[in-house]
Structures are given as C-alpha cells and as structure tokens.
Amino acid sequence: MSKQDEVIVVGKFGASYGIRGWLKVVSFTDQPESIFDYKPLLIKVKDEWVEFSVESWKRHKGLVCKLEGLEVREEAQAYTNLEIAVKADALPELSEDEFYWRELFGMEVVTSQGYGLGIVDDIFETGSNDVLVVKANLKDAFGKKERLIPFIDEQVIKVIDREAQRIEVDWDPGF
C-alpha cells in the first residue's frame, strides 16, 4: 500500500451528545483538538473509507463535534464507535531524524555488535521517554520472549535505517 493510499486512524466517535446530532470524539493525536485540523477526515462505512466534514466542534468534558448533515440524535447514534482516519499523506512531513510510531512497527532491532534482539511489536509512553516493546526471536540465546528498550536517542538508539527497516541499539541482549 503506497503512502498515498494508506490511512491512519486518529480517533473515534463516542456516544451521541445532546439532541441536535452532536457526537463525542476520542482523539488519539498528541494535542486532542488537532484532530480537526486534518483534511479530509475519513470514516469507515461498510468496509470503505469515506470523507466527511465537521460543521462545528467544541470542548465539553472532552471534545464534541457536529458533522454536516446530522441534525438529530438518532442520526448521530449510527456513528458511535466508528473510527476517524486521515490519509497518510495528510500528515506533516518529518525531518530525517523524526519518526511516526507506525514507521517503527515491524523494524528489526539489533545491538551495535550485530546481535538480533527481535522485531518492534509495540511502543508505549512513559513519563520520561517512549519504550520499544521488542518481540524476541524464537531462538533467542538468552531465553527472552520480549524486551523493553527505552527510546533514548543517541544513548540507546544509535541508528534508525528506514530503508533497511532496522534499528541499531546500544543494549545488553541479556537484559
């Protein structure tokens, strides 16, 4: 799938809000309200992504929005739990040393000495830095099934090679 065709889920609709067709919005973006900055927004209807327009949005114990064409609560209820997405090419371009998490999933992780630690399976945030969840190779010499590696640039993460789909780390394979 080319970047032009790829869609990225950036949120989802929650329950309807009020009687005039408004919906609660759960945003997955760093700044929750920035979900409304992306154009066009897409929703998945019957296994197909379709564009929609936000008529208005506001903060009210979170985010709520009104979609164009929805006038009553019953119409809005049909959108509950639908995912909100954008086309990947609508996301801002990053510099060479910046990455979207989605780019790191599936990359091979190796130590500076060439030992294969496994594949990036997940990433999560902590208070100080992000952490790579690396699913270990089946025949890992250290008997590890999973490793948690802090994403600390230059100190732990040495090189990220997009072309080779490889991350080089300064990490003890026994840990």
UniProtKB/Swiss-Prot annotation:
A Gene Ontology cellular-component term: cytoplasm
Keywords of the record: Chaperone, Cytoplasm, Ribosome biogenesis, rRNA processing
Record-annotated PRC barrel domain positions: 95-175
Compartment(s) where it occurs, according to its Swiss-Prot or TrEMBL record: Cytoplasm
A GO molecular-function annotation: ribosome binding
A Pfam family recorded for this sequence: PRC_RimM
Keyword match Chaperone: yes
BP terms from Gene Ontology: ribosomal small subunit biogenesis; rRNA processing
Comment, domains: The PRC barrel domain binds ribosomal protein uS19.
Similarity annotation: Belongs to the RimM family.
Subunit structure: Binds ribosomal protein uS19.
Role description: An accessory protein needed during the final step in the assembly of 30S ribosomal subunit, possibly for assembly of the head region. Essential for efficient processing of 16S rRNA. May be needed both before and after RbfA during the maturation of 16S rRNA. It has affinity for free ribosomal 30S subunits but not for 70S ribosomes.
Name recorded for this polypeptide: Ribosome maturation factor RimM
Recorded name of the encoding gene: rimM
